[in-house]
Amino acid sequence: MLRVLVETRPPRARFVPGAEKEPPLYAFLLSTAVIFVAELGDKSQLMAMTFATRYRVRDVLIGITAATALVHLASVGIGYWVGDAFADSQDTIAIVAGVAFLAFAAWTLRGDELTEAEANKAKSATGAAILAVGVAFFLAELGDKTMLATITLATQEGWLGTWIGSTVGMVAADALAIVVGAVLGRHLPERVIKYGAAALFAIFGLVLIAEGLGWF
């Protein structure tokens, strides 16, 4: 199924900002779903819930959106460059991407919690809400699995759709955590989320590997 979608898409354009008039729907939907899953149970959700106890939810979400957009713009730039530089080795890239998603599955099972320093920083944040939240999330997302997942997706899909989709997916997941925390007064069901997200990562990784090997 994924191979059919890939083969029917138009040739990849070079990475030129503004070159695409509309975000590719496939890349947008795929990236939104994958990053939403990657963010479930992530430390960023805990940070979002903590910040929401100090600042207005609107300001928290604006800060998260700004930070995510910047980090993921860099991520898709890296991923798209890799995909473009190795355009003649797409099968190999698919296999490597598949292995990466299997690693993300293991990472998810291991869990990702706030360190004491990160928790204290979120609780004691002062100053302009949007700036405080934005800086904290920007630093927290550098090297995080959502950033790495975005890079991996961008090696396979259009950069603009991946950028917008990954940003929407992360903000939606963090907004969900804030709402659940505010309405229900508790975290999302950690065990169910952990195993469900890991399973989805593993399935997607295996599909990519199978495509790279030409099995379907």
Q: Can you name each region flagged by the protein language model?
A:
Residues 4-24:
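Short, Lys/Arg-enriched N-terminal segments with co-localized hydrophobic residues
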Residues 20, 24-25, 110-121, 160, ...:
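Structural preference for solvent-exposed beta-strand-turn elements
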Residues 22-87, 149-171:
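Juxtamembrane transmembrane-helix termini in multi-pass membrane transport proteins
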Residues 26-30, 60, 94-97, 125-133, ...:
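Residue-level signature of transmembrane alpha-helical entry/exit and packing/kink sites
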Residues 56-122, 179-187, 193-199, 206-209:
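Membrane helix-loop-helix hairpins that form the core translocation module of multi-pass transporters
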Residues 100, 132-136, 176, 202:
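Interaction-mediating elements
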Residues 118-149:
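Selected transmembrane alpha-helices and immediately adjacent juxtamembrane segments
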Residues 137-145, 203-216:
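Hydrophobic alpha-helical transmembrane segments in multi-pass integral membrane proteins
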